[in-house]
Amino acid sequence: MCIKIYSTLIGVFVVGYLLINHNKYFCSSKIVERYYNKYFFENKTLKDLPDTPLIAINATEVTQNQLMTFSKLKVACGSNYPQGIILPDEIPVSLSVMASSAYPLFSPVTISAEYFADTKKDVEEPVLIDGGIYDNQGLHKLDERKSAYGTDFSIVSNAGNAELNDEGMENVITLLYKVMELLMNRIEKMQMRKALYQPMEPQIEMEKDKRCAYVALMWTPSERAIDGYLNNIQDSLVPRYVYEANGINEEQAERLRQRTMTQEERRQCNEIVKEHIKWAELCENQNRVIEAWARAKNVGTNLKGLKKTEINALVTLAEWQTILQVRLHLPHLIHEQV
């Protein structure tokens, strides 16, 4: 009996040890990278990526707590790995994607010396994990003017739908996973606030503005977006050149900011914005979009395969939300005039 008990305890200890240290003995990221390469990227390297659009893949470099960005232009991260240290031409796309998604159960990804410009130089290999740990929305490199990837205007798609709950909290592995989900959710919200809810001078010129159309697939497709847009004008979150493009004049905007607008006047502003963004046209497919939203919100951002109906739902919802948000927040990018 004692032997059986000891054997069981030893077995539990070994299994627990391997679970905690599985990356040391079982490099899961290498295996997944090989599958990525075989089934998706077919031995393509960064030099095979198109010149336009410029594709940038983010990973978090653990030792520097900074983003390492992979692209056809360069692979760089902070002062330890400036442009030219790592050569992008031969780095597999599969390695870049694996580094960008190495979370939470995959082992960290390293870039070996064979990809360095000087293979004999004593440079520590970067240790990479999911880029979302540092930059959950992929906005960091886009809104920096000195960045090689900086843009004046951007469309951000957030497909996250994680709902935090207390299920499985007694399990230490599940607990750690939920802690990471909480952290990434917090980063996501902070970046969204910076992109959408940062007060500005209404008179800012388009050339000096860095505007973002933020598309959150889990937002309910409804008229609430129009009301929220007016609230943003009220809180000085929308510059003049944007709201004027959607039919709101300066007098109306000032009354919104001063909180002196009557309900009837606000209703009229609502109708003006609707006319300029072609709300009636968007409503033609709204029932189909609501059905797509109901299906899409249950699609997880994990490695589980998607059904064709789920893919179609995501496409339908993303298209509708993108058209709406671009018409509201980036109207000057649309060539056709109402």
Q: Can you describe what each PLM-predicted range is?
A:
Residues C2-S147, E167-E170, V299, R327:
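Active-site gating loop/helix substructures
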Residues V32-N37, L176-Y177, M192-L196:
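Well-ordered, non-membrane alpha-helical segments in soluble/globular domains
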Residues V123-N136, K141, K146-S154, N158-L164, ...:
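C-terminal helical/tail subdomains of lipid-metabolizing enzymes
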Residues N171-L175:
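Short, hinge-like loop/turn segments at secondary-structure boundaries
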